[in-house]
Amino acid sequence: MAHKLLNDTFLRALLRQPTDYTPIWLMRQAGRYLPEYNATRGRAGSFLGLAKSPAYATEVTLQPLDRYPLDAAILFSDILTVPDAMGLGLEFVTGEGPKFVRPVRTEDDVARLAVPDIDATLRYVTDAVREIRTALTDAQGRQRVPLIGFSGSPWTLACYMVEGGGSADFRTVKSMLYARPDLMHRILDVNARSVAAYLNAQIEAGAQAVMIFDTWGGALADGVYQRFSLQYIQQVVSQLKRDHGGEKVPVITFTKGGGLWLDEIAETGVDAVGLDWTVNLSKARERVGGKVALQGNIDPSVLFAPPASIRMEARAVLDSFGNHPGHVFNLGHGISQFTPPENVAELVDEVHRHSRAIRSGAHAPA
């Protein structure tokens, strides 16, 4: 599959096909733990200056690949580009994170929401996808690794849109959810249609897999999650292009704190489910029964440990999954900005080394 790809291990793993080793990429792999990223961000002048420049986005997307033999690149962007395109006025305040100038709080605010014109408002993202694909490809037309596109989930975007930024307790958005579920469903429907259009635009531009980040799904109660997050993830997935240019485009979804709902998430039509570090990978594999691939799920804090400990914990994750197709190694959440870059090299090397040993029979998982 994926002709001209020098390394298609990641895509094959997502489709539960046999691979010679377990592929690895890291959430937030292009980020502040890398000095070269910080240098580029300094030149860009701000985070938004970085994210909205296809040239800078391409530069930082490739930085971790130049350091480590990772098996996929992920578009450098931010999940809040979609509500920004809806006119909410995204700002990044130093020390406070993202803020929206015009949060969605009233019935009138909700009534004004509409699916943005992706080509007009988010062209910088699709341009970045095209530029990254070009930068990943050599003079002979051979691409190093696949490129992942992504978006936030409808619910996670709604959290930021209603709260006006990050939140410790989601009081404002949950108040709306329980007091005015009609308004919340309207927001989520607009978000779902927007996310589907956005991801399809990324696929058309050259993204070879896409991921839906449901970062705050785990903040919801059982039963509420299904109605206000999972239902809308399924709506997005049902609208996605699953083939482009004769190749399958796998879809991954990740609900942080969503281990409780693994069986239901696996029924949404996605190809792979991301797991955080609280989930037992062996039991998760048994639960989904080969229906989907699994991605994850080492604790990002392991990367603060000495190299021997990092390697031991990586082996434990690989042994837990065992010698089966359908595993993409990743962190259970995004990499910390305080991670020593040299420790990432230890992790990537051990994942490749130990998974090859498992495949060859030189090491039998417990």
UniProtKB/Swiss-Prot annotation:
GO terms for cellular component: cytosol. Pathway: Porphyrin-containing compound metabolism; protoporphyrin-IX biosynthesis; coproporphyrinogen-III from 5-aminolevulinate: step 4/4. InterPro entries: UROD/MetE-like_sf, Uroporphyrinogen_deCO2ase_HemE, Uroporphyrinogen_deCOase. Signal peptide: none annotated. PROSITE patterns: UROD_1, UROD_2. Substrate binds at residues 28-32, 78, 160, 215, 333. The keyword Lyase applies. GO terms for biological process: protoporphyrinogen IX biosynthetic process from glutamate. It is found in: Cytoplasm. The record marks 78 as: Transition state stabilizer. It catalyses: uroporphyrinogen III + 4 H(+) = coproporphyrinogen III + 4 CO2. Pfam families: URO-D. Its EC number is 4.1.1.37. It comes from the Bacteria. Belongs to the uroporphyrinogen decarboxylase family. Catalyzes the decarboxylation of four acetate groups of uroporphyrinogen-III to yield coproporphyrinogen-III. Homodimer. This is Uroporphyrinogen decarboxylase. It comes from Paraburkholderia phytofirmans (strain DSM 17436 / LMG 22146 / PsJN). The lineage of its organism: Bacteria, Pseudomonadati, Pseudomonadota, Betaproteobacteria, Burkholderiales.
